[in-house]
Amino acid sequence: MKIRNSLRSLRNRHRDNRLVRRKGRVYIINKTNRRFKARQG
């Protein structure tokens, strides 16, 4: 999982990326291509 300041550019890299908020943190998850996982930090 990558930890990035800005997730907007990462979200646009793959069409299956989803922006998810869990426990006050923002995540990018991708069911089909899991190497795009990221967390904002």
UniProtKB/Swiss-Prot annotation:
The keyword Ribonucleoprotein applies. GO terms for molecular function: structural constituent of ribosome. GO terms for cellular component: ribonucleoprotein complex; ribosome. SUPFAM superfamilies: Ribosomal protein L36. One of its GO terms (biological process) is translation. PROSITE patterns: RIBOSOMAL_L36. Keywords: Ribonucleoprotein, Ribosomal protein. InterPro entries: Ribosomal_bL36, Ribosomal_bL36_sp, Ribosomal_L36_bact. The keyword Ribonucleoprotein applies. NCBIfam families: PRK00831.1 (NF002021). Belongs to the bacterial ribosomal protein bL36 family. HAMAP family: Ribosomal_bL36. This is Large ribosomal subunit protein bL36. It comes from Parvibaculum lavamentivorans (strain DS-1 / DSM 13023 / NCIMB 13966). The gene is rpmJ.
